[in-house]
Amino acid sequence: PYRRQRQMCIRDRIKSFYMGGGTPTTLSAGQMDALLTAVNRNFDLSDCVEYCIEAGRPDTIDREKLQVLLDHGADRISVNPQSLEPRVLSAIGRKHSPEDIEKAMELATSMGFPHVNMDLIAGLPADTPEGFRRTLDTCLTFGADNITVHTLSLKKGSRILLEGLPIPSAEDVAAMLDYADPALREKGFAPYYLYRQKYMSGSFENVGWCISGAEGLYNIYIMEELHSILSLGAGGSTKMVDAKRNRIERVFHPKFPLEYIQRPEKLTENLETFRRFHQEMAR
């Protein structure tokens, strides 16, 4: 039943495909190839104008995996250093080095990905305004056409909270963000989307910056809430949007992988809700 419902729900052509995060590139090249082959076989991507993969941690990226992404049509990836300060990377448990980040960016740009994003986080443990400035200034030399500047969000159950790691003050986070704005503008970047999360340091925000023409459509679709988003996988949240009637509904997949696998009836129910919603839109 789930497969039949899936086929009924994915007849519409996809405008933007996004596979994220987490870090999909923890999969092997063979696993990634099998997964993207299934995506291309089951979805109509003939009108797809954006194919984005979260490459995530630089220590999960190699030439073979990136070639698989290119072979399947990926035109946008994200490499997420978060920081280039060794003591910050150590404090947050990251295994990669600043040199790994530079090598990953060199590889991605040399292989010809049209768009590459880098994620940075202001307010990480052990960071300082000076360290954040060094990180941003260096990242601006790597050739990314998108840079997303996040503010640390202290999520419940996070290692930072559980271990009581000291974090920069709100004043220091403000100094980091105050530096980012003119530094990015000077290099031709402009902000194009903004959002807030709960428990953010200093009650600041996350801002996506890009070079003109390099905007990420999926990011815009999420922020505008004018487009339906069909989500697949454990923890996924499907958003159904009927802009004409000013109506939005959401359905959620089971969060944990084992629960997701053991509850196919929930997946069938969610897909039926998606199908019924779009039938009503067409009336």
Task: List where the protein language model places each region.
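Canonical radical SAM enzyme core domain
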Residues: 3-4, 24-68, 81-84, 96-100, ...
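Glycine-rich beta-strand-to-loop/alpha-helix junction loops that act as flexible
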Residues: 17-24, 150
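Conserved C-terminal portion of the radical SAM core fold
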Residues: 72-78, 83, 99-163, 170-198, ...
